[in-house]
Amino acid sequence: MMWSNFFMQEEDRRRTAVGRRRAQEQQNLGLTPEREGKIKLGLLVAIVGATLAVLAVGTEFWVELNTYKTNGSAVCEAAHLGLWKVCIKRLWQADVPAGRETCGPAELPGEANCTYFKFFTTGENARIFQRTTKKEVNLAAAVIAVLGLTAMALGCLCVIMVLSKGAESLLRLGAVCFGLSGLLLFVSLEVFRHSVGALLQGVNPETPPAPRLAYEYSWSLGCGVGAGLILLLGGVCFLLLTLPSWPWRSLCPKWGGPTA
């Protein structure tokens, strides 16, 4: 009985020592429950931006190209494209809204022909409605978008390491990665906008003549804009968490507590 009590006391002492050591490590790392909650909230914001970014880059509804409706024809053509592929659809004019002068929107049911851009493999330009893409601009937009996704993934990894390993020094790096990813997405959107302008001007001097086109940006590009804004917001939030608390206490004594 005496030996059993002795072993039980030793086990309690060991557990107490382990608990104190873990608490000391947590205190040394600076990850208080309140701070950990703020980091998790910032990570949640960044995950929303990451989801929108992947959705934008992976879909092909960045811009819609619509031909004008013609009298005496039952069908009309519209196209929608993104960073990787283009889809040309033949739509029934009866399905097009009556007050609309152009064919579309591209979400209407119809016969679709989707192809990936060949300038990623063979280096050939694509032809859309007797117009030729400018592959250098399209390639630049796609590469910049991929770099943005890479920076976003590195930012997520840094924040996860902060939460799991307590490596709080990586929080600043994560903030920079998220901010950089948001900026790269905006640059990719701007480069893509220039590629659309180059496509509309790249008319081939061939017969039959190229049809008149109207264009409108679609929901994939909207997701990209939202992703860039949210990722920038996440980067700013993480950057604020890396700043020391004493400047905020001096600027806002009511919020930061009493100052001596």
UniProtKB/Swiss-Prot annotation:
Major location (coarse): membrane
Entry's transmembrane regions: 43-63, 143-163, 169-189, 221-241
Highest taxon listed in the record's lineage: Eukaryota
Subcellular localization(s) per the UniProt record: Cell membrane
Membrane topology category: Multi-pass membrane protein
Keyword Transmembrane helix recorded: yes
One GO CC annotation: L-type voltage-gated calcium channel complex
InterPro entries: PMP22/EMP/MP20/Claudin, VDCC_g6su, VDCC_gsu
The keyword Glycosyltransferase appears for this protein: no
Family, as annotated: Belongs to the PMP-22/EMP/MP20 family. CACNG subfamily.
Function: Regulates the activity of L-type calcium channels that contain CACNA1C as pore-forming subunit.
Protein name: Voltage-dependent calcium channel gamma-6 subunit
Phylogenetic lineage: Eukaryota, Metazoa, Chordata, Craniata, Vertebrata
Underlying gene: Cacng6
